[in-house]
């Protein structure tokens, strides 16, 4: 299945929450999409449907396709620790996500474009792979020739997010992936254990 590129508000309404961040359109219409959205009731779902919905929410939130997401789950399952928590930590360590968390881009979708269009470096080297896995201590910066881009400047000016596991120097337009975030430091409203149960069926 191809990556979804349609209206983010429609997907947010499907899950009943603003999974892509602040969304004024969602706030106005926070009911299911479709002609009869207002009349639809979020009725009782089966266990499988609930687990599947949670997996879809995570994939949409991070902008990850099924093959990549399953690969991350396998890596998490093979690691020591709580599988669901490690899965989210792997998602958070992706370059596109960190670019978003640092405020270089207003959304993860925009962050993927910024990375793909060669506007970001990691430890001084140009990296254009959104799924690139960062390690603690890695330095992420806006490429010198891209520092004057209006879209990046506007995003940084509007960013108010502060995370303990990353640092950002506005003057140098450079930040550091200090550490892998603990589960409590990840703000996403995702019930990762449901995803683990789904994949373990």
Swiss-Prot record:
GO terms for cellular component: small ribosomal subunit. It comes from the Bacteria. InterPro entries: Ribosomal_uS4, Ribosomal_uS4_bac-type, Ribosomal_uS4_N, S4_RNA-bd, S4_RNA-bd_sf. Keywords: Ribonucleoprotein, Ribosomal protein, RNA-binding, rRNA-binding. Signal peptide: none annotated. Residues 93-153 form the S4 RNA-binding domain. GO terms for molecular function: rRNA binding; structural constituent of ribosome. Coiled coil: none annotated. GO terms for biological process: ribosomal small subunit biogenesis; translation. PANTHER family: 30S 40S RIBOSOMAL PROTEIN, SMALL RIBOSOMAL SUBUNIT PROTEIN US4M. One of the primary rRNA binding proteins, it binds directly to 16S rRNA where it nucleates assembly of the body of the 30S subunit. Part of the 30S ribosomal subunit. Contacts protein S5. The interaction surface between S4 and S5 is involved in control of translational fidelity. Belongs to the universal ribosomal protein uS4 family. HAMAP family: Ribosomal_uS4_B (MF_01306_B). This is Small ribosomal subunit protein uS4. It comes from Flavobacterium psychrophilum (strain ATCC 49511 / DSM 21280 / CIP 103535 / JIP02/86). The lineage of its organism: Bacteria, Pseudomonadati, Bacteroidota, Flavobacteriia, Flavobacteriales. The gene is rpsD.
